[in-house]
Design a protein with these regions (language model features):
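A structural signal for well-ordered alpha-helical scaffolds and beta->alpha junctions
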Residues: 77, 93-96, 125, 170, ...
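Flexible glycine/acidic-rich beta-alpha junction loops that bind and position SAM and/or redox cofactors
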Residues: 117-123, 141-177, 193-203
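A structural motif corresponding to the C-terminal end of an alpha-helix
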Residues: 1-8, 39, 67-68, 99-111, ...
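Catalytic cores of alpha/beta
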Residues: 119-136
Length: 252
């Protein structure tokens, strides 16, 4: 049945790790170049990438996929610059953003960014979403390419949840997001409005990450111990990178 699967397959999803690091991805893309006429013409090809491979590899990827119909590219980020690099160890935000803005030129069917909403990203999340909306409007106008985002609230590990933050910071970040939503709501998809409203409500109303693991003093102790070790082992600096949350962190 494997030899006939391509005739009836409706969607093929490629995730990772980073797919561009796998020889299997390149073999598949080579197959698409020579056998495309055999594929179900309505098949949706979804590829999830961190978008930070070496430039040469990324350019090779663009060349390979530029003629694939119904191509959807997924990536993940939720903060800007050094805060993004801190949260996602190994991230190079400048490289990520440079590669992101190259994507609409190949005219995929859709580009999707998945945000994992944790305590740390809340400092620069509105700024990050500003860039998303700016590109969303430009790419639709110039390339007729759809770009959207999801806000997926982190639940585990519990000590990285937004709910570990003190009430004053949660209120501050909630208000920032509500202001952002009010300003940009006309440019958002219904799904994006729903995700942003849900996060605003979550920061405002929800008090415990989940009942089985809620011990706020312990979670905050774990938060401090984890990032202290993270700084030492990865040569990072929490307080310098997150000046708003860092003031509270320094007092734990």
């Amino acid at each position: 049945w494997e030899s006939d699967l391509h005739k009836t397959l409706d969607e093929l999803r490629i995730t990772g790790g980073e797919p561009m690091m796998s020889p299997s991805l390149w073999r598949l893309l080579d197959w698409f170049e020579t056998q495309r006429e055999k594929v179900n013409p309505k098949m949706r090809l979804a590829i999830n990438s961190n978008l930070v491979p070496k430039r040469e590899l990324f350019c090779k990827f663009l060349e390979k996929v530029k003629n694939i119909p119904n191509l959807h590219i997924y990536t993940s980020n939720e903060a800007t610059y050094e805060q993004s690099n801190y949260i996602r160890d190994g991230m190079d935000y400048t490289s990520w953003y440079t590669h992101l803005v190259n994507l609409p030129g190949i005219r995929p069917a859709g580009i999707h960014n998945m945000c994992t909403v944790n305590a740390l990203c809340l400092e620069s999340l509105p700024e990050f979403l500003d860039d998303v909306v700016k590109n969303k409007k430009a790419w639709k106008r110039v390339y007729d390419v759809d770009f959207n985002f999801t806000l997926n609230i982190l639940r585990f590990p519990s000590f990285q949840s937004p709910l570990v933050l003190p009430d004053n910071l949660r209120t501050k970040f909630k208000d920032n997001l509500q202001t952002w939503l009010d300003k940009n709501i006309e440019d958002l998809e219904p799904m994006e409005v729903a995700h942003t409203s849900r996060l605003v409500d979550y920061l405002d109303i929800v008090k415990t990450p989940h009942s089985e693991a809620f011990d706020l003093p312990k979670l905050r102790a774990d938060f401090k111990n984890f990032y202290k070790q993270y700084d030492e082992r990865r040569n990072k600096d929490f307080i310098k990178t997150f000046p708003i949350i860092g003031e509270w962190y320094n007092g734990l």
